[in-house]
Amino acid sequence: MYRSSFLREVRKEKYERSDAYDELRGSPEFDSLAQAQGLENLQELNERFASYINRARVLEQRNTILRKQLETFQRMDELVGLDEAFAGQIEFNRQRMRELASDRAKLEREEKDAQRMLDEYHNKYRNEREYQQKLKETLERLNKEADEALLCNLELQIESQFLQDDINATKDRYKKNLMEIQTYVNILQQIIQTTPRVSPITTGISEEKLVAERRIPVLQSQLEEYKSILCQLQAQKYKLQTETTMLEQAIKNTQESYDDEIQLYNEQIENLRKGIEEAERTLEKYTTDCRQLVIYQQSLENELERYKRIIENEDSRLNSAIAGTPVTLFTQIYRPVQPQASRGRDITQAMQEIASVKPRQKALTKKLSRKKEIMSKDITDGLSPEKLYERTVEVFDQDQLEFRHEGSVTCEPGQEELELVEKEAVPEDVPDGAQISKAFDKLCNLVKEKIRVYKRPEAKVDSHPKGRYVLVTGEEGYEEPCFSSIPAGGGITVSTSNGKVTIGGDVEPIPELPEPSEPSEKEKRDICERRDEFETQDKLKEEEKEDLFEWGKIRGKIEQVTKYPDVSEPEAVPSPGLISPAEPGVLQETDHDREDKQGLLFREAGLPGSVSYEKVEVVESIEKFSDDRIQTYEETAMIVETMIEKTSKKKPGDKGS
């Protein structure tokens, strides 16, 4: 499948010469200047012939390409390849549906297993929580018992301290009483020993002695009683000390045992906490897996629903195509997926490549207009051919680099709406058959319109130069991507009205133009706007045809007036738009031709009243489309300078006016 689009821009510049030109015609300086101008005109004519030859070769290539395209489209009307393609696509979709059904059953089994494991982990987690609750209750009970034992120990210590104080106080009191009694006894013994035995006194003393003796047993009994009480208190003191020691030892042992048990319980609690955290992490992991499985199941269900809609649309479209009845399409917007590497190029990719041409063509139009301004500015400023060639090559190379940079395809990573932890294989996307049919019909209409647009009419007789005829022979030298051809050398035959025939050397074929990069896929929505641009280009091409016809008539008049001698074609024809500075000997002349040229250049009786220069710049952009890839190249061709001499002469009396 081929389609070619041509873009031509014509720019004219005219310069007029005043009547002061007639005043210098008799001077020898004017003769030498006229001879130099004649040589320059011959050189320009030779350059124009080279441009014409290149133009003829381009037209020849276009004619061949259009003929092959017409044959291809005629053969495509007879082929029925879309039904087979759609049948294969439907079979592939059914196979994918069966595979997805098996994957769905497998995922359902995995979901059941995951649900069972989740229930088991729930039960384990519940049991662990109950066991931990029991341990917490036991720990709280033991803490309460330890607190009660500590309080009891403190109370016993306080009570023993009070008892010890009472024992000490009673012991001190009894010691004081005993010391007093002993003091009294000693005093009485001293009194008895020192007292004289006088009868009355003795009688009195005896009475007192009797009284004292009677009191001694009482006092002794009291003393014995006090001693027994003291012994009892001492025994009670020892008993209390023993009990206190035993209680202290019991408290110490209980504290140590409680510390050991608390340490053991703390270790058990820490282990249980770690187990609970591990169980929570495992539970969270399995919960995430279950959620991912549910999401994946939902995506699979959506994809199955989309495939069902696609199959329904295809069945409805095929039934409507067979029965001739309208059909309602059920479309669904879905995100594109990365196709598998094992499959080849499908129809959707081809349509996207075809649809992405217009933005690049706009960029080429801007580049061509910029080239045109640069080249016209250089010519107006009077640059030499060598400088002009260098600047043109630099601009051309820079634009080629920009074009390749803009036409390159940048593969961005696929942004998915939902990313799973475990990467799953994404099924291949399936194009919509109705959209493919519409895009294909629109493409065929555009190609047919382009074929109708570029059917050029045959050139008129008066548009050819009079007195000089150019015959260009040779086959095309451009290698098509799908049609192979053998480049052949071209020949040029120039004949004049005098009968001289000059056959130029072989013309080198046009070198193969560079292949562009593939366009970006994001430009496919611009395919619907190409019709308006094609209509605008058609109008421009009609205006360019009229300008070219006018220029052909003017060229015939120039050749009738000047009648230049024979010139031959240069040895090598440069590519369009590039004038090679490395070929200074563009004109190959003989001495006889130079004499004829100098003699015939100003053979007319009077010189023209005014001279006008016209510059015509033709810029072409050619784009090729094929079913394998898109090829785009451009030709910035020819700058033609034409000198128009008007033969109307003025009278001597009219010069002053």
UniProtKB/Swiss-Prot annotation:
Region feature Linker 1, mapped onto this chain: 74-82
Region (Linker 12): 183-199
Site (Cleavage (by CASP2, CASP3, and CASP7)): D432, G433
Tissues in which the UniProt entry reports expression: Detected in eye lens fiber cells (at protein level). Detected in embryonic eye lens.
Annotated region (Head), positions in chain: 1-38
Any Pfam family hit: Filament
Region of interest (Coil 1B), ranges: 83-182
Gene3D superfamilies, sorted: 1.20.5.170, Vasodilator-stimulated phosphoprotein (1.20.5.1160)
Entry's Gene Ontology molecular function annotations: structural constituent of eye lens
GO CC term (a single one): intermediate filament
InterPro entries: BFSP1, IF_rod_dom
Chief location bin: membrane
Region (Coil 1A): 39-73
One example of a Gene Ontology biological process annotation: lens fiber cell development
Residue intervals of the IF rod domain: 38-318
Topology of this chain in the membrane: Peripheral membrane protein
Keyword field contains Membrane: yes
Biased composition (Basic and acidic residues): 519-530
PANTHER family: FILENSIN
Function: Required for the correct formation of lens intermediate filaments.
Record's protein name: Filensin
Source organism of this protein record: Gallus gallus
Classification lineage: Eukaryota, Metazoa, Chordata, Craniata, Vertebrata
